[in-house]
């Protein structure tokens, strides 16, 4: 009993942090506290500051949420890791399951600062690689899987969480001490602060050790610059292969997306799912839209009145979209509807059917007279790819489907 109380005395704050962050991520809090699930990933300067840098956009006050942690790191180093980080605490508990492997971490090179440098430099290039390694977004992504309706594909957002725990059992403390980029960023900030203090106190400003460190940093940054610029020019697929949520930039979402699962949790219709390979390896677990939800009682298309997913992205992969603009169709299309004339009741069977025209909220479907029957034709300039036509088409198989827009 005394040992348990002693343990709680040392780690009580970390336990509270895990519980609070988990409740926020799950949304099991009062309505007034629901924005906390959006705030959690943005507490990391990797997602808030470097994400905004990579997206080249100012996302309001939320960008500043990562500033306190970054400033604190200059004075207290990795205090967030050792006192508050929920992912780090769980990884530490998992490490205790293998007391025989405690020394194994010493054989693993410290990559955390290098990973933080890669993210920072590639963000400056406009294509932030590896941003999804942030521990807060990994923690958040695991709890994003527990949403209604449950789907095994959605559970894949928690693979990083499980992988870190398994890795911590195999090589105790390897995540926190060797791999975590957020820890590396905090350590780099503390190292910089200490170096500046030593330089100021030194009698001679020419510090050879500092010069060596600076030289190593420059040498490490060069490959990151090359990777960022090369990826920005197009390491991904040549064309979009999936319908993305509104405001997503198909050319950069694979890099900007943190795989935190916020957009999937926010969608009230359960239409957003993690990609499982249709957009290439670099697009794994990024959000894609499936225009037929699992709940037949809910709307099965991207509603004209909903822009919830665009309000919760911590990195700018989805840009905020005002509900009024969504209703008016003043946003970039997420896809375009295509009529299969061989399957369409009007075109193939000469029977009157105007269901797609009736349900289209953007008046993108017009009827053209062919013989005695009015047949649907899609105006690609008006179509936003919402899928209202597809989800209500009475034909079997469906005669009108939303196709992804080709990448420009």
List where the protein language model places each region.
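Non-ligating segments of multi-cofactor redox enzymes
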Residues: 1-408
């Amino acid at each position: 009993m005394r040992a348990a109380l002693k343990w709680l005395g040392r780690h009580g704050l970390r336990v509270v942090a895990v519980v609070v962050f988990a409740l926020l991520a799950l949304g099991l809090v009062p309505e007034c506290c629901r924005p906390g699930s959006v705030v959690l990933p943005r507490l990391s300067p990797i997602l808030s500051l470097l994400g905004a840098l990579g997206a080249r956009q100012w996302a309001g006050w939320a960008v500043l949420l990562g500033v306190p942690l970054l400033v604190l790191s200059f004075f207290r180093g990795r205090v967030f890791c050792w006192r508050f980080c929920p992912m780090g605490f769980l990884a530490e508990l998992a490490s205790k399951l293998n007391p025989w492997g405690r020394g194994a971490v010493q054989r693993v090179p410290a990559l955390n600062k290098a990973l933080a440098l890669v993210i920072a430099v590639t963000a400056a290039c406009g294509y932030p690689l590896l941003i999804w390694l942030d521990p807060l977004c990994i923690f958040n992504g695991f709890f994003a899987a527990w949403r209604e309706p449950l789907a095994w594909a959605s559970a894949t957002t928690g693979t990083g969480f499980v992988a870190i725990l398994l890795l911590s059992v195999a090589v105790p403390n390897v995540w926190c001490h060797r791999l975590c980029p957020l820890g590396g960023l905090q350590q780099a900030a503390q190292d910089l602060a200490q170096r500046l203090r030593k330089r100021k106190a030194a009698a001679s400003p020419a510090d050879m050790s500092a010069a060596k460190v600076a030289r190593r940093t420059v040498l490490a940054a060069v490959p990151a610059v090359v990777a960022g610029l090369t990826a920005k020019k197009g390491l991904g697929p040549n064309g979009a292969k999936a319908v993305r949520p509104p405001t997503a930039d198909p050319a950069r979402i694979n890099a900007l997306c943190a795989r935190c699962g916020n957009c999937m949790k926010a969608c009230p219709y359960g239409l957003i799912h993690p990609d499982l390979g249709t957009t290439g390896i670099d697009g794994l677990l990024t959000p894609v839209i499936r225009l037929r939800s699992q709940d037949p009682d809910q709307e099965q298309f991207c509603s004209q009145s909903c822009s919830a997913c665009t309000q919760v992205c911590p990195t700018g992969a989805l840009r905020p979209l005002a509900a009024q603009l969504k209703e008016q169709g003043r946003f970039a299309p997420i896809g375009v509807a295509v009529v299969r004339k061989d399957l369409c009741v009007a075109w193939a069977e000469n029977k009157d059917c105007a269901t797609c025209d009736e349900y289209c909220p953007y008046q993108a479907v017009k009827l053209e007279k062919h013989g005695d029957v009015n047949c649907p034709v899609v105006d690609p300039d008006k179509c936003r790819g919402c899928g209202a036509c597809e989800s209500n088409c009475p034909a079997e198989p469906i005669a009108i489907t939303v196709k992804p827009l080709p990448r420009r």
